[in-house]
Amino acid sequence: MKEYQTITEISGPLVFAEVDEPIGYDEIVEIETPQGETKRGQVLESSEGLVAIQVFEGTSGIDRNASVRFLGETLKMPVTEDLLGRVLDGSGQPIDGGPEIVPDERRDIVGAAINPYSREYPEEFIQTGVSAIDGMNTLVRGQKLPIFSASGLPHNDLALQIARQATVPEDEESGEESEFAVVFGAMGITQEEANEFMEDFERTGALERSVVFTNLADDPAVERTVTPRLALTTAEYLAFDKDYHVLVILTDMTNYCEALREIGAAREEVPGRRGYPGYMYTDLAQLYERAGRIQGRDGSVTQIPILTMPGDDDTHPIPDLTGYITEGQIYIDRDLNSQGIRPPINPLPSLSRLMDDGIGEGLTREDHADVSDQMYAAYAEGEDLRDLVNIVGREALSERDNKYLDFAERFEAEFVNQGFDTDRSIEDTLDIGWDLLSTLPKSELNRIDEELIEDYYEDDAESVEAEA
């Protein structure tokens, strides 16, 4: 272990020290203050004879007389099944007042990419209890499905709802229910948001099956880049060593990318698009690609990263690059939010690329794909007609067009809108879908198999009259 007492400058969260030998990039550092307090940091920049260290806990109490110890290793996460139910800060230290964590082992937080040959294709359904996701943009075990939101929208409420409600439905054939866990990584959140998260986790009992990492807005930027890696290292251990199905929720990835930009500026790197580092695509891929399933292992890692699009712009580098790497997106819509729709998910620009592999008979229900396709088509038709109504008025529309307008309104009010406390099973979601589709004449249901229409279509006086 190398120890120095050569601090030359302290600037904000940065400490600069002179060294007489090469120091590794990202190496972990312990700084002991003259008062005996020990703080941890990470090497941000290492040049000949001088290193820049970003301190996790802030630089208060550190002066030129402090001792700097270079530990010769990068950050490692102590992993154990006992992490379930615990709350940690953004650098992996417990902050819940619980007992000391005794790890089974310590793992490098960078992790290793899953060998493509040993990957198993994601194809089992995860039920979030949210109709707009389960019914229209189904989440599949091992998938990475981001939520695209914007400033002022209730993405945190949706994140908590998913963390609370998400389950892997019981395998009826084996009669066994797989163990399910949630790893929740919050980056750059305010103290108020952190308190809301913890109150919700504790009130609903979701904390028992969760590991929570919280990096606050006033914590150092380098810690923000560490938090998702700690969360994913924990998830990989629970999934591939302990056979859990783990859902990783990361919020807010925009704060993570801002931290990358801040660190890049401190290193005087040549910036890329809009000042973000040129390697941001690779960096994000290193996080997102840690989702998946491995042959011969029972567990899985599924990711829901949440990001706020600056200026509601989906061409901004953060959502743009995220869209290239991930397998779809869920859009939080500002107009739906202003109408009081909760959660305000717009199904039309949303997409789950792996949905078709995780639904159908034996997974969800035989009619799932057809119902989803038909609702997409009917809602899109209703949306187009809304634009027409603004020009010609509703009385100028045909009876058929009015039915589609009514469908669009009921679809938003009854299917998408369910509140943040309602947990719907996939059966409930599909039944609501049939209830809405049954307001349209059977002749309009051209995306659904006739046998399914006979089994599920709800005939009423209006429909019979329309058919006649």
From Swiss-Prot:
Report the membrane topology from the UniProt record: Peripheral membrane protein
Q: Which domain of life is it from?
A: Archaea
**InterPro entries registered for this protein in UniProt:** ATP-synt_VA_C (IPR055190), ATPase_a/bsu_AS (IPR020003), ATPase_A1-cplx_bsu (IPR005724), ATPase_F1/V1/A1_a/bsu_N (IPR004100), ATPase_F1/V1/A1_a/bsu_nucl-bd (IPR000194), P-loop_NTPase (IPR027417), V-ATPase_su_B/beta (IPR022879)
The alphabetized list of GO BP terms reads: proton motive force-driven plasma membrane ATP synthesis
Secretion signal, residue range per the UniProt entry: none
GO: which molecular function terms? ATP binding; proton-transporting ATP synthase activity, rotational mechanism
Spell out the SUPFAM superfamilies in the cross-references.
C-terminal domain of alpha and beta subunits of F1 ATP synthase (SSF47917), P-loop containing nucleoside triphosphate hydrolases (SSF52540)
What are the entry keywords?
Answer: ATP synthesis, Cell membrane, Hydrogen ion transport, Ion transport, Membrane, Transport
Transmembrane regions: none
What Gene Ontology terms describe where this protein resides (cellular component)? plasma membrane; proton-transporting two-sector ATPase complex, catalytic domain
* CDD domains cross-referenced by the UniProt entry: ATP-synt_V_A-type_beta_C, ATP-synt_V_A-type_beta_N, V_A-ATPase_B
List localization entries: Cell membrane
- Would you identify the family this protein belongs to, as annotated? Belongs to the ATPase alpha/beta chains family.
NCBIfam families referenced in this protein's UniProt entry, alphabetically: ATP_syn_B_arch, PRK04196.1
Subunit info here reads:
Has multiple subunits with at least A(3), B(3), C, D, E, F, H, I and proteolipid K(x).
What does this protein's UniProt record list under function?
Component of the A-type ATP synthase that produces ATP from ADP in the presence of a proton gradient across the membrane. The B chain is a regulatory subunit.
Its name, as the record gives it, is A-type ATP synthase subunit B
